[in-house]
From Swiss-Prot:
Protein name per Swiss-Prot or TrEMBL: Probable nicotinate-nucleotide adenylyltransferase
Role: Catalyzes the reversible adenylation of nicotinate mononucleotide (NaMN) to nicotinic acid adenine dinucleotide (NaAD).
Species annotation: Aliarcobacter butzleri (strain RM4018) (Arcobacter butzleri)
GO MF: ATP binding; nicotinate-nucleotide adenylyltransferase activity
Known pathway: Cofactor biosynthesis; NAD(+) biosynthesis; deamido-NAD(+) from nicotinate D-ribonucleotide: step 1/1
Superkingdom assignment: Bacteria
Family: Belongs to the NadD family.
Catalytic activity: nicotinate beta-D-ribonucleotide + ATP + H(+) = deamido-NAD(+) + diphosphate
EC numbers: 2.7.7.18
GO biological process: NAD biosynthetic process
Keyword line: ATP-binding, NAD, Nucleotide-binding, Nucleotidyltransferase, Pyridine nucleotide biosynthesis, Transferase
Length: 182
C-alpha cells in the first residue's frame, strides 16, 4: 500500500490545509492519505485549540473525502511524539510499501533538527507544500506540491478571518474563538 502522511498542528485548520490534501490526492499515487495532528509540537510553545478539538475539527472537514483518514495516534500519546515513531507505527499498521511525508514549506528550515532525521529520510519521500512568501534554497532537494494560498495558522490564531476557515467548521471556529476571548 502507498500512503501519504500529513502531520501538523492544524491549530486551527485552514483552507491551505484542505488545498494540500486535495493536491496530494491529485498528484501522488497513493491508496490512503493519513492526517496526523500533533499532541505537542517540539517547535511551538503552546496551542490555541486543545488536541482532541483539533482532531474532531479535522474529522469534520475531511469526513467525506475519499482515501483520507484522520489518525489520533500522536494525540493518544499525550506527550511529545516524534515523526520517526509515527512513521514506523503507520508503516506497520498499513503495511506500507511507499510512504510520502507531506509538510509545509515553513518546516523545511528545521528539518535537520528532527529526531532521527537521517533514518526518517531513508523511510519516506518528503513532499513539501510550498507557500506564498516563503523562499528556501532547500526546496530543490524535494518534490513539491504548489499551493498558492497565503495563510497560516499563526495568523489565524491572532485574528480569525472566516474566509480562510473551511466552511465545514466556520461556525465551530467562531464559537471556539469567542469562548477564548470571554
Amino acid at each position: 500500500m502507498k500512503i501519504a502522511i500529513f502531520g501538523g498542528s492544524f491549530d486551527p485548520i485552514h483552507i491551505a490545509h484542505k488545498a494540500i490534501v486535495k493536491r496530494a490526492l491529485e498528484e501522488l499515487e497513493i491508496d490512503k492519505l493519513i492526517i496526523v495532528p500533533t499532541y505537542l509540537n517540539p517547535f511551538k510553545s503552546s496551542f490555541y485549540l486543545e488536541p482532541k478539538v483539533r482532531f474532531e475539527l479535522l474529522k469534520k472537514v475531511f469526513e467525506k473525502v475519499e482515501k483520507v483518514e484522520i489518525s489520533d495516534y500522536e494525540i493518544n500519546q499525550e506527550k511529545l511524539s516524534y515523526s520517526f515513531n509515527t512513521v514506523n507505527y503507520l508503516k506497520d499498521l498499513y503495511k506500507a510499501s511507499k510512504i510520502y511525508f507531506i509538510l509545509g514549506q515553513d518546516n523545511v528550515e528545521n528539518l535537520d533538527k528532527w529526531y532521527k532525521i537521517e533514518e526518517l529520510k531513508k523511510m519516506v519521500e518528503f513532499v513539501i507544500a510550498t507557500r506564498s512568501g516563503y523562499k528556501s534554497d532547500k526546496l530543490k532537494d524535494f518534490r513539491t506540491l504548489n499551493i498558492d494560498i497565503d495563510v497560516s495558522s499563526t495568523l489565524l490564531r491572532t485574528q480569525i478571518d472566516t474566509k480562510y476557515i473551511p466552511k465545514e467548521i466556520k461556525e465551530d471556529i467562531l464559537n471556539l474563538d469567542k469562548g477564548k476571548k470571554n
